[in-house]
Amino acid sequence: MNKEQLKTPFFMIDEAKLIQNLEIAKQLKEISGVKLVLALKCFSTWGVFDIIKPYLDGTTSSGPFEVKLGYEKFGGETHAYSVGYSEDDVREVADLCDKIIFNSQSQLAAHRHIVEGKASIGLRLNPGVSYASQDLANPARQFSRLGVQADHIDPAVFDSINGVMFHMNCENKDVDAFIALLDSISERFGAYLNKLDWVSMGGGVFFTWPGYDVEKLGLALKAFSEKHGVQMYLEPGEAIITKTTDLVVTVVDLVENGMKTAIVDSATEAHRLDTLIYKEPASVLEASENGEHEYVIGSCSCLAGDQFCVAKFDQPLHVGQRLHILDSAGYTMVKLNWFNGLKMPSVYCERTNGEIQKLNEFGYEDFKRSLSLWSVQ
C-alpha cells in the first residue's frame, strides 16, 4: 500500500514514533515503580493496542463503553471512572473493571454496594491546585464539579475505600511544577493516603516531551509511593501518542480575501475539534518559518472561523497538494463527527517495516446510520 495513493483525508499513525514514546514510559516505570494506564478518553484507536500493550499496565476510562473497550481489546488492569454514574452504568462495568473511581461521596454511597467484592473502590479528590494553561481544562477551576473538595471530605470515607485519584494536570511539561503539586498533596492529604492501597495522579503529565527529566519524575513518584505506602498510578494519554500521527489532507481550492486561504478536504469542527475549542493552531509539516508565501489553512466546513492555522511556505501552494497536519492523535479520532456530512478520515498505521495497514474507514452508510436507523410510522 503506497501512502501517495491513499485518498485524503486520513490519519497516519507511525509505529516507530509510538514506540519511542513507549520506551520512555517503560523507563519511567522502571525508575519509579509507577503503573501506567492508557487514558482512552484521549486515544482509543484499538487497532494499535497490540503495539502499546507490552509497555503499559492497562486502561482508564471516562464512560461505560470505554471500560468495555479497554477490557475487551487491551486487557491488563481496567479502571473505570465517570463524573456521573447512573446505576445502570455501574452495573454495566462492575464485572469488567479492576478499579472503579467515584467522583463524589454521594455517588460512592449510592453505588458502592454494586461493586463491593468485585472491584477495588476509589474516590476522586480535588486538591484545589492544578497545572492547566486554559481554564476550560482546569480541574481546579472555580465551582469545579470534578472530585471532592478538601473541606468537604468526610474522614470516615477513607476507612471504606482502597484508593484515590487526583487529576490536576493538563499538558504539564514542567517536572518541577508537577513535583510541587505532589508535595502539596502529600502535605495536605498525607494522613488519609497512609490508609490506602493505591493513589492515581491522573493524566496530563507530559513525560515524553523533548528534554523532560524522566529520572527526576520517576524518583519523585517513587519517594511519594514509599512515604505513603501506596502503589502509584499515572493515566497518560497525550504522553503516549504525542507526535505519532499526521492528519493528511489535500488542498482543494485557493481563495483570497485580503489574505490567501488554502481550503483543504478536512475540518477542525469535524476532524480536529480541539484546534477549534482551545484555539490552538495546528502545525503543518510542509510549512517554513521563514517562508515567503503565507496562507490560512482553511477547512471545507461551513463554519466561518473553521481553520487549522496560518502558515508560511517556501513555495506557493497549489490545488492537489498534500499537507500533513502534525501531532493529530490525541482527542481527534475519539471526537470525530459528521458535521456537514463531510467524509470522515480513514485511519492507517505505518509499521516499522514500512508496511501501511488500514485500521478503519468510513462511508455514507456510517453517516446515515449515525442519524437514524428507523423512520417514523
UniProtKB/Swiss-Prot annotation:
Is this entry keyworded Cytoplasm? Answer: yes
Alphabetically ordered keywords of this record: Cytoplasm, Decarboxylase, Lyase, Polyamine biosynthesis, Pyridoxal phosphate, Spermidine biosynthesis
Origin superkingdom: Bacteria
Residues bearing N6-(pyridoxal phosphate)lysine are K41
Q: Which GO terms label this protein's molecular function in UniProt?
A: carboxy-lyase activity; diaminopimelate decarboxylase activity; protein homodimerization activity; pyridoxal phosphate binding
Q: Which GO terms describe its biological process?
A: lysine biosynthetic process via diaminopimelate; nor-spermidine biosynthetic process; spermidine biosynthetic process
Reaction catalysed? carboxynorspermidine + H(+) = norspermidine + CO2; carboxyspermidine + H(+) = spermidine + CO2
Q: What are the record's GO terms for cellular component?
A: cytoplasm
**Binding of substrate: at which residues?**
E238, D274
Subcellular location(s) per record: Cytoplasm
Q: Which cofactor does it need?
A: pyridoxal 5'-phosphate
What EC number(s) does its UniProt record assign?
A: 4.1.1.96
Q: Relate the protein's function as given in its record.
A: Catalyzes the decarboxylation of carboxynorspermidine and carboxyspermidine. Carboxynorspermidine is decarboxylated 20-fold more efficiently than carboxyspermidine. Exhibits some activity with L-ornithine, but shows no activity with L-arginine, L-lysine or meso-diaminopimelate.
Protein family: Belongs to the Orn/Lys/Arg decarboxylase class-II family. NspC subfamily.
Among PANTHER family, the record links this protein to: CARBOXYNORSPERMIDINE_CARBOXYSPERMIDINE DECARBOXYLASE, DIAMINOPIMELATE DECARBOXYLASE
Q: How does it assemble?
A: Homodimer.
Identify this protein by name.
Carboxynorspermidine/carboxyspermidine decarboxylase
What species does this protein belong to? Vibrio vulnificus (strain CMCP6)
